Amino acid sequence: MMASLRHSITSALRSSRQGCSKSAQWQSLDQQFGALRISSRSLSTHAHDHNPNVDGQFIAAPALSIDNFKLHPYARAVPVSPSYFTRTPRFYDNYLSLEKLMEEYEDLPVIPATAVERVAWKTLEDIRKELGEQVKASEFARCLALVKRLNSIHPDLKPQEIKDVLDSFRRNVQPFTNVAKPIPIDQFGRACGVGKRKASSARAFVVEGTGEVLVNGKTLAEYFGRVHDRESAVWALRATNRIDKYNVWVKVEGGGTTGQAEAITLAIAKALLAHEPALKPALRRAGCVTRDPRKVERKKHGHVKARKMPTWVKR
């Protein structure tokens, strides 16, 4: 009897204790969830005190300052150029830009090679001096091939960005656009031409006449003793059948008779073109308008002449 009474009292006390602990536990959980309750307005950077549904005061977070942001000491700096780790980064940047333009405008029509404008592109030495990098010849050749391919695009369809890139590869001086000034004819009907050969230089004044030729105030027969030199001096007139239609007065100096005669040929041809420009193809075929750049080769020490060596004797 006493045992059963003791057991009932013990079970009653145990149940009351568990009820108290569970109620306290649920009360603490309610407080924690209340503290963690987050509304959509609490995520805003502005406080909404006028809203009665929000309990308590909300203060906006301070603004972030990028100036005061400190970089991590072990952070890796990103290179400015994708070609930073190459041997010639500036050159490869230009090369990649050309490849990008080529991929974008590859389908544009091109003109024949004979119709493409002649342009003097920068040389390998110019690129090396401009970029300050030791560019390889093979790499520069590939780059120049892309430049010429872009330059062959039809001028009416060529975009402005391609023109800007091509201008950066052009030389400052374009020799193909330099045109020689035409020789004027003075008030007396004279045209003055200048010619050079070896160490000789000649100035020829050509005027319409009957075919008289004076060299330093003398006739051809008096000035040149050799028939070959006489024929060479007036070869420009004889090749165009104008030997009896113009009078020529020549001032020549320097060199020998052969050099003076060929210098006179070039001078007369240039002056004749001032009177009749249509004769240029005939004079070119006759070899009268192209200057001969050959000069006497100098003598070397140990040689008898420029090339000749002394006779070798075995003993």
Swiss-Prot record:
GO-annotated biological processes = translation
Keywords assigned by UniProt, alphabetized: Mitochondrion, Ribonucleoprotein, Ribosomal protein, Transit peptide
Which segment is the transit peptide? Answer: 1-42
ATP-binding keyword on record:
no
Location within or outside the cell: Mitochondrion
The family database entries (InterPro entries) matched by this protein are listed as: Ribosomal_Su5_D2-typ_SF, Ribosomal_uS9, Ribosomal_uS9_bac/plastid, Ribosomal_uS9_CS, Ribsml_uS5_D2-typ_fold_subgr
One Gene Ontology term of the molecular function aspect: RNA binding
Q: Pfam families, per this entry?
A: Ribosomal_S9 (PF00380)
For this record, the Gene Ontology CC terms, alphabetical, are: mitochondrial small ribosomal subunit
Biased region (Basic residues) positions are 296-315
Region Disordered, as annotated, extends over: 293-315
**Family, per entry:** Belongs to the universal ribosomal protein uS9 family.
Describe its function: Component of the mitochondrial ribosome (mitoribosome), a dedicated translation machinery responsible for the synthesis of mitochondrial genome-encoded proteins, including at least some of the essential transmembrane subunits of the mitochondrial respiratory chain. The mitoribosomes are attached to the mitochondrial inner membrane and translation products are cotranslationally integrated into the membrane.
Assembly with partners or alone: Component of the mitochondrial small ribosomal subunit (mt-SSU). Mature N.crassa 74S mitochondrial ribosomes consist of a small (37S) and a large (54S) subunit. The 37S small subunit contains a 16S ribosomal RNA (16S mt-rRNA) and 32 different proteins. The 54S large subunit contains a 23S rRNA (23S mt-rRNA) and 42 different proteins.
- State what protein this is by name: Small ribosomal subunit protein uS9m
Tell me which species this is from: Neurospora crassa (strain ATCC 24698 / 74-OR23-1A / CBS 708.71 / DSM 1257 / FGSC 987)
